[in-house]
Amino acid sequence: MERGQDTPWTQSTEHTNIQKRGSGQQTQRLEHPNSTRLMDRYLRIMSPVGMHKQIVYWKQWLSLKIPTQGSLKTRVLKRWKLFNKPEWIN
């Protein structure tokens, strides 16, 4: 495949950033559309406060994906209480 041809994949993942030089000549630079946003997010996460928030978020996410024995017990008890309500028994 020639370098000049864009596939749908490259069109969707990259965009062309056109800049004008002092002489009026245009230069093109391929850049990921979210690269600056990704870098900003990375810098925020790597700050001490951002790092703490990220750790808390991942702990919450992991507790949903890999439940501990305590959280499983809580879930089972809640389900059991809902299932054994008096109006369901009659």
Curated annotation (Swiss-Prot):
Localization: Host mitochondrion inner membrane; Host nucleus; Host cytoplasm, Host cytosol
Any GO BP annotation: symbiont-mediated suppression of host cytoplasmic pattern recognition receptor signaling pathway via inhibition of MAVS activity
Region of interest: Mitochondrial targeting sequence: 65-87
Stretches the record annotates as Disordered: 1-33
InterPro entries cross-referenced by the UniProt entry: Flu_proapoptotic_PB1-F2 (IPR021045)
Chain intervals with Polar residues compositional bias: 7-28
Pfam families xref list: PB1-F2
Record keywords, A-Z: Apoptosis, Host cytoplasm, Host membrane, Host mitochondrion, Host mitochondrion inner membrane, Host nucleus, Host-virus interaction, Inhibition of host innate immune response by virus, Inhibition of host MAVS by virus, Inhibition of host RLR pathway by virus, Membrane, Modulation of host cell apoptosis by virus, Viral immunoevasion
Record's GO cellular component terms: host cell cytosol; host cell mitochondrial inner membrane; host cell nucleus; membrane
Membrane-crossing residue ranges in chain numbering: none
Cited function: Plays an important role in promoting lung pathology in both primary viral infection and secondary bacterial infection. Promotes alteration of mitochondrial morphology, dissipation of mitochondrial membrane potential, and cell death. Alternatively, inhibits the production of interferon in the infected cell at the level of host mitochondrial antiviral signaling MAVS. Its level of expression differs greatly depending on which cell type is infected, in a manner that is independent of the levels of expression of other viral proteins. Monocytic cells are more affected than epithelial cells.
Family: Belongs to the influenza viruses PB1-F2 family.
Other noteworthy facts: Is not encoded in all strains, and seems to be dispensable for replication.
Subunit structure: Oligomer. Interacts with human SLC25A6/ANT3 and VDAC1. Interacts with host MAVS.
Name of the protein in question: Protein PB1-F2
Gene name in the database record: PB1
